[in-house]
From Swiss-Prot:
This is Probable host range protein 2. One of its GO terms (biological process) is viral process. It comes from Yaba monkey tumor virus (strain VR587) (YMTV). Plays a role for multiplication of the virus in different cell types. Pfam families: Pox_C7_F8A. Belongs to the poxviridae C7 protein family. InterPro entries: Poxvirus_C7/F8A (IPR004967). It comes from the Viruses. Disulfide bonds: none annotated.
């Protein structure tokens, strides 16, 4: 059958989700993100990896570069269902972000490529690679509540009893 992990990336300060960035099959995950900016900007990203444990004992860590410079990716939490990572970086010109578990140059034909034009608020999947990836804007409320509680304050306590995001 083959391994099929699930990976979502949340670009929190743009309220944008890159969903289903996993390969159709295989023990590798990653993507290329072209960021277009007009001025200095900080980006905060949350990575949610849902491993397929059927044929592996541990997950490969997520690594990241911006314009070929290493960016620290911190593991925030880990459970049997998912591993959550975060990263933050600052850019002042158009940049290429590589998110990967394995050598990105080896997988450049299968990892997806996305362009995020921040000033114009335009987002595009340039190449899906071997994935079913899509862009979600804005990030849906269930994902915000599960993974981004500290990033977004969007819910009044009065309405918490009606929250349908709980599993």
């Amino acid at each position: 059958m083959g391994i099929t992990h699930e990976l979502d990336i949340f670009v929190t300060n743009e309220d944008l989700a890159l969903k289903n960035i996993e390969l159709f099959k295989g023990n590798s995950y990653g993507c290329f993100i072209n960021l277009k900016v007009k001025e200095e900007k900080r980006f905060n990203m949350i990575f949610v990896l849902r491993p397929d444990w059927s044929e592996i004992d541990s997950v490969k860590p997520i690594r990241m570069t911006v314009n070929n410079n290493h960016v620290d990716v911190e593991k925030v939490s880990e459970s049997i269902h998912e591993v959550v990572y975060s990263a933050s970086f600052l850019i002042s010109f158009n940049s290429l972000v590589k998110v990967f578990s394995d050598d990105p140059d080896k997988y450049k034909n299968v990892y997806p490529t996305v362009t995020i034009n921040v000033p114009k608020k335009k987002f595009k999947v340039v190449d899906q690679g071997n994935t079913y990836m899509f862009i979600q804007y804005p990030i849906d409320d269930c994902d915000k509540e599960r993974f981004l509680k500290d990033e977004f304050k969007y819910c009044d306590n009065e309405y918490d009893q009606y929250n349908d995001c709980d599993e």
